[in-house]
């Protein structure tokens, strides 16, 4: 036996609505528009058991639960919109303690088409959803704009759409004299902090130095926002300028040994490193060379220069993975031009003991000659280092 609606819904002595345990007043947005707000606009004397009337401009949000007819976590009210100015269209949303501020974009409310059984007609329903209303979201702020303090009180304001005129000729909508339905609720503190709890790890990360990108220019890396700001630093300050290469056998990013501090003797032999992939060697650090030379006495230039002699014949291989091909500069001429440009700063270095003339090289063994040219990769012509020796010896 099914109980009647009148036996389920009872009125208390104070006029409030009482529902048995388990029953809640939880209408959809379309039901709020069509079953309550539309009836109020068609008949201003319409009253509803679950929805009362209230002037939102004279009530603070924390006072509204006690004025509602029913509800535990959300409360519904009919409210008459109040214009801020007699000749304007702006709504007055201020209270004694604060104001309601609209947030986000108004949402459309549609009435779903009635389910029609079209199987007997051999077709399908072509009815579309009908736009019947709009919903605006507002948040209550304490104080006065624009320096108000945001609270967790939220209101959804439902209003009718002009499309309903087509179905209700007696409906008169006046923006300055309009009823709306307001749903007020207090948002939990945890709901607003859900996104803030998902904190991402903060750390200063440096991108892995890639062999697929040429080392040209200065690279800038942005660190994590640790102190509330963006920190930038140069890769040149934290990474060894040795240029990396990829080994086809292991596919592991590795770097050749740092040969800057090694001085190759004429009689010493050096083992040549052969790889199947194209390798890139290091060029001299001119900046360090100038600093070291400038800080030392003017009479002694050979000591700081010996640390970089091994780099003067270390040149990049042709046709590498970085796109260095035939259009690359003639580094032999570039090195000579750099020496000439720096001779006023570092004076003319004496390479006589390090790079002998061609006459002195004639009697050297093959292993000694390999020591002078060991850094030349495969496929690149051997550079005549003895020309450097002849050049400097002749100028002394």
Curated annotation (Swiss-Prot):
Domain spans labelled NAC: 19-187
| Classification via PROSITE patterns | NAC
In which tissues is this gene expressed? Expressed in phloem.
Pfam hit, one: NAM
Q: Explain what induces or represses this protein's expression.
A: Induced by salt and cold stresses.
Sorted keywords for this record are: DNA-binding, Nucleus, Stress response, Transcription, Transcription regulation
Q: Does the keyword Ubl conjugation apply?
A: no
For this record, an example GO cellular component is:
nucleus
Specify the superkingdom.
Answer: Eukaryota
Example of a GO biological process term: regulation of DNA-templated transcription
Q: Cellular location of this protein?
A: Nucleus
Q: Per its record, what are the GO molecular function terms?
A: sequence-specific DNA binding
Instruction: Explain the purpose of this protein.
Output: Probable transcription factor involved in stress response. Binds to DNA-specific sequences of CLPD1 and OAT promoters in vitro.
Q: What is known of its domains?
A: The NAC domain includes a DNA binding domain and a dimerization domain.
Record-given protein name: NAC domain-containing protein 77
Q: State the organism of origin.
A: Oryza sativa subsp. japonica
| Origin organism lineage | Eukaryota, Viridiplantae, Streptophyta, Embryophyta, Tracheophyta
